[in-house]
Amino acid sequence: MSESAERKSILDVVGIQKLLPHRPPFLLVDRVVEFEAHRRLVALKGVTMNEPFFQGHFPAQPVMPGVLILEALAQAAALLATMSLQPDEVKDKITYLMGIDGARFRRPVVPGDRLELEVEVTKQKGAVWKQTGVARVDGQVVAEAEFMAMLADRER
């Protein structure tokens, strides 16, 4: 069992759903295992053959779409921002992705892999957060990118 598989959850999927608007099948973070406010977060996503995207990408040789690996990193980045603030600061707020730079894909992610999603804050000014994200499987980098996001009022 890998080191990341043995780590205890800081936040499980029920807690994650209280902070993110995403729901299955588009919720791509299973649990948070490390967190330092305003600095860094590590989350995990177990990739199974039951993921709906594997029905068409690609049936004979299933590979997780790179854009969904980036989405998983963006969801981890949103968790880092919302968990870093006080509950009254994020009440009725939603995190919107504003940009992705420097996205790179290093190797395929396949059923049975466990994605480790590590995000770090590089800059924060007001409601805008800049972060770097690295996705790994078994310690090997599978994808990386820089993200910019903003916490905004939820529409009612």
From Swiss-Prot:
Question: Which top EC class applies here?
Answer: lyase
Q: Which domain of life is it from?
A: Bacteria
What biological process terms from GO does the record include?
A: fatty acid biosynthetic process; lipid A biosynthetic process
User: Which GO molecular function terms does the record list?
Assistant: (3R)-hydroxyacyl-[acyl-carrier-protein] dehydratase activity
Q: Which InterPro entries match?
A: FabA_FabZ, FabZ, HotDog_dom_sf
Q: Does the keyword Lyase apply?
A: yes
Pfam families listed in its UniProt record: FabA
* Primary site of residence: cytoplasm
Q: What is this protein called?
A: 3-hydroxyacyl-[acyl-carrier-protein] dehydratase FabZ
The organism of origin for this protein: Anaeromyxobacter dehalogenans (strain 2CP-1 / ATCC BAA-258)
